[in-house]
Amino acid sequence: MIEIDGSFGEGGGQILRTAVALSCVTGKAVRIRNIRANRPKPGLAAQHLKGIEAAKIISNAEVEGLRIGSTEIVFNPGSVRGGNFRVDIGTAGSVTLIFQTVLLPLLFADRDSTLTVTGGTDVAWAPPVDYFKNVTLRALREMGAECELEVLKRGYYPKGGGMVRLTVRPAEMKGVVYERIDEIVRGVSHCQNLPGHVAERQASSARNFLEERGIRAEIRTEVLKGLSTGSGIVLWSGYKGGSALGERGKRAEVVGQEAAESLYRELMSDAAFDAHLADQVMPFAAMARGRTEYTTSEVTMHQKSNAYVINTFLGKVVKFEGNKIIIK
């Protein structure tokens, strides 16, 4: 049985997600101790529970310790089965963090899958759904992943209610040496149950910030009605992204500029990937045939924690050379 220390490095939910995903794909049972030990509320939160439950269903796993607040679980997988699955997080828990747990196993399933997740599409401390769709999945398609993502409804904190459908076909993943891609900036500025000018002002502010620096941006707007109220903006170019969320009392212009500034910082780096993508791609590259290489704009503790889990499962397959990450 693989033993993982959940307090390693940043000690967050990413260790859990990567460990469960790799357990499903490799068929190796795993014990994860000290889950989220470095967080104010240690142990499993509702969101982690839902991700593990989904992985349990698709891999016919036996799981011990699956309850809120649990600081240790044992996950013993069977074989991964494709099919139609639904996950309702029940809160504004992030839909993309569920995908981080189950997308990798579904790429190695016995047949096509459709996964519909209800929860938060645009929430703090998680990749926005448009980033996952336009940056993460783009990088994974280069490896051979075949998946499509549809945003059916948006969900914001605290009510959630967003709905996203991910279609996955089993694929033979191959390593890629990624190069930086320079493209026009694209994006989406959205608001729900708010006046349409909120989305327009976010977009205009982001566009102006970038164009003042010689960067052209095409940003569409979405004005929606739904269960939850909120706004946000996501920008992307090649393998890099930037985003910001609206908050009560925060001017739309500030939201737009925050997103533009975060993308601009990434674009000023010579690296192929932004720091978040460098983290997210790692488990997929580890299970692909052949060698994957990319440079990251910043080496983070999140990446180091992910590498720790991968190397514990598979041997020393992830190496850092300065800001270059090599996976083979």
UniProtKB/Swiss-Prot annotation:
Keywords: ATP-binding, Cytoplasm, Ligase, Nucleotide-binding. CDD domains: RNA_Cyclase_Class_II. Its main location: cytoplasm. Its EC number is 6.5.1.4. The active site is at residue 302. GO terms for molecular function: ATP binding; RNA-3'-phosphate cyclase activity. It is an enzyme of class 6 (ligase). It comes from the Archaea. ATP binds at residues 100, 276-280. It catalyses: a 3'-end 3'-phospho-ribonucleotide-RNA + ATP = a 3'-end 2',3'-cyclophospho-ribonucleotide-RNA + AMP + diphosphate. GO terms for cellular component: cytoplasm. One of its GO terms (biological process) is RNA processing. It is found in: Cytoplasm. Belongs to the RNA 3'-terminal cyclase family. Type 1 subfamily. NCBIfam families: RNA_3prim_cycl (TIGR03399). Catalyzes the conversion of 3'-phosphate to a 2',3'-cyclic phosphodiester at the end of RNA. The mechanism of action of the enzyme occurs in 3 steps: (A) adenylation of the enzyme by ATP; (B) transfer of adenylate to an RNA-N3'P to produce RNA-N3'PP5'A; (C) and attack of the adjacent 2'-hydroxyl on the 3'-phosphorus in the diester linkage to produce the cyclic end product. The biological role of this enzyme is unknown but it is likely to function in some aspects of cellular RNA processing. This is RNA 3'-terminal phosphate cyclase. It comes from Archaeoglobus fulgidus (strain ATCC 49558 / DSM 4304 / JCM 9628 / NBRC 100126 / VC-16).
